[in-house]
Amino acid sequence: MNGEIKMLDKELNLFVINTNGEKKYIPNFGHVNAGFPSPAEDFVDDKISLDERYLTHPESTFLIVVGGDSMYPVYQKNDILVIRTDLIPLHHDDIIVSVNNEDYTLKRFDKINNKLIAINPNYKDCVQIHENDEVVILGVVGVLVREKTNRI
């Protein structure tokens, strides 16, 4: 493939999001400061649709759950990632990628040096992408969802 990076064929639909046109809305209480609390009910701004905000292109969006720790501390085990297949990866985007038919992995894309980087300092190795490597990119990380408690 001569070092060319290709995006995943749109016909492969892993964990595709289908909202069936229905949007769910939740109250928006504005911004929150990390200082002293105030009664949030006094500051209801409007309602937010997470669909409208984060699932703007459901036909080219899927979810994937993080396993492993090569991208810690930014990404942690069991984080949910909203992946966009229609975005072209830019320098330092985090992508779901396979090199030479290896398993797909989450890595930071160093477009300038043509490398895939694990951001965990315990992982010193980067994957250098060579001219003849076959690189398949499933998509670009668009949103990170992390549960703060285990009660959800």
PLM regions and their residue ranges:
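Structural motif
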Residues: 79-80, 93
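Glycine- and charge-enriched low-complexity intrinsically disordered segments
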Residues: 111-152
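Hydrophobic beta-strand signal
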Residues: 82-83, 96
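Residue-level recognition of short, solvent-exposed, well-ordered loop/turn junctions
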Residues: 76, 90-91, 136
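Short, compositionally biased
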Residues: 69-72, 92-115
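Short, surface-exposed secondary-structure edge patches
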Residues: 71-74, 85-88, 132
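Short, positionally conserved secondary-structure boundary motifs
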Residues: 1-73, 77, 143-152
